[in-house]
Each structure stands twice: as C-alpha cells, then as structure tokens.
Amino acid sequence: VIGAPLFIISGPELVIAQCKAGVIGSFPALNARPQHVLEEWIVRIKTELAEYQEQNPDAKVAPFAVNQICHGSNDRLMDDMATCVKHEVPIIITSLRPPAELVEAAHSYGGLVFHDVINVRHAKKAAEQGVDGLILVCAGAGGHAGVLSPFALVREVKEWFDGTIILSGSIGDGYSVASSIALGADFAYLGTRFIATKEANADPEYKKMLEDSAANDIVYSSLFTGVHGNYLKPSIVNAGMDPENLPEADKSTMNFGSGGNTKSKAWKDIWGCGQGIGRIEDSPPVADLVSRLSEEFNDAKDAFLSLIHISEPTRPSLI
C-alpha cells in the first residue's frame, strides 16, 4: 500500500506513522511552506524512521515519498527537487507533466520516480521519460481523477509497461487492496481512507463528513482547480454553491505557485474525496487502520482461495 500525497493534510506525523506501519507514506512538497520547511520535514522523517528501525530491528519500515507538481505555475519545483536530491528522498511522485529532468535527478542517487496518469496516452508519455512506475488514477479516485475503469486501464498498460504499477481509485479497505493486486497492480494507492486517521492534518469536520458520507455524496467537477476531480458534496453546499449546477473551468485556472491559489478554496474548504468513502466509519490511528487493512486483505485472499477450492501455494486453472 502507498498512502497518496494529500494537499494540506499530509505532513510528517502522517507520513511517519504510515512508514512505521509498513505503508509507503508521502506528502506534497508544497505542503511544506515556506520552501525551507521542506528540508526540515525530510530530515525529521528520515531521523525518526531511522531511530524507530534501530529500536525495532524486526519491523518492516517502509520508505517515504515526496510529491512534485510539474506545472509552470509551481515556482518552487526545481528548488524543491534540489532539496530532495540533497537528502536522497527514496521515491519521487510526480504529477501533471512527464518530468524528464526530475527522473534524471532522482536516478542520480538511486531514487525512484512514480508518475500519476489518467489514460494510456499520458502513461506512454511518462514511460518515454524513463519513470520507474505509473500511478493509474482511475474512476472514483479522490481529488484529481480520471474516468477509466481500472479493469481497462491496468490491463492495457500492463501489455507494454514492465515497470511498477500502482492503482488508485475507490480503494477504501483491504478487500479493495486485494482486488487491486489480483488485477495486476503492484501497489494500491489510498488517499481518502488516510484522511480519516488520527495523524492526518485535516479539519475535524472533514473527518466527520467522511465518516457520515457515502459514494452518492461525491461530485465530479473541474470548477475548483481547472482539472476534473471528486469532491464532497456537503462541503460544496457549505461553501454556498449548488453542487448540481457547477460551471466548468479550464486548465488555465490552475495555479501551484508558492503563494498558492488565493482565489480558489479547493482543498481548504472544498474537500476532495474518493468514491470508496462508504467504508469509512471512524478515524483511528494509522497503525490500527493498517492492521485492519491487513486483516481484510487476508480475509479477501482466503475467500477467493476457498471459492476456487484450492489451498496455497497451488496455482488455479481457469480452463
């Protein structure tokens, strides 16, 4: 499992808890403001994880990742990447433009680059730049999301891409994680489920809204950032807008500058959310959630093996 980078919400506390629990934790570089805070966060994460590993030598501590937004309005991009190179961040997650220069920078110290895409055309462009993995953001993902079914996108990409496949979209429990792996993904990418955790830097009302809502409370719109994404309907209503009559926006409204997009309240007041929300009923500590995910994953695996009347490690025949 990879914990997706969550704008505003992902900070050192959440990332450290995820990695200690064996989940790859991540955060957007732009969450660390001003720019020099990014180095402080990276040093803190590396230090605390190293200390935890030393104190718990048998623990499976996962690496962490930093998300870079590759857009012309992000005036911090190269400075942020220089900081990541300096401290040899294990994984760089890139969004929007295929990042040739970032791939080269990460590979200079042995780092990996995973790029998020919503269709095959974008996936091929990213693969041409030498990324190590593709994050397939399918229908139902929280925040910026695509519209393709994972059954279509995962299987088509695997026909030609030999790198790491990460699946995103409506993955809210261990059963969904197991389904992702069965489909051919190497990792499941969970964002919304980690918003509703003790360590997440989210408004308590946001967490409560996640616990109280379901899939039919999700609205897909481009209004708030210029790119289509999934958002919580009640948060749109609370902001004084009609979720059933939202105008469309275009990509020219996107702004990832160091000062932020002062005109848009996306992420702060308009809350992103995936369609897997129906399984969220509480906001536990990350460690407890990951333990639950593991139990559900194993339950799903056992149910499948029982269904086809075999026991591990025999491989089933579908003929």
Residue locations for each model-derived region?
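Active-site entrance/lid segments in N-terminal catalytic domains of soluble metabolic enzymes
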Residues: V1-T164
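Tryptophan-centered motif/residue detector
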Residues: F7-I8, W41, W267, W271, ...
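Conserved protein kinase catalytic core
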Residues: S73, T197, L318
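Conserved active-site-proximal phosphate/metal-binding subdomains
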Residues: V147-I166, G172-L307, S311
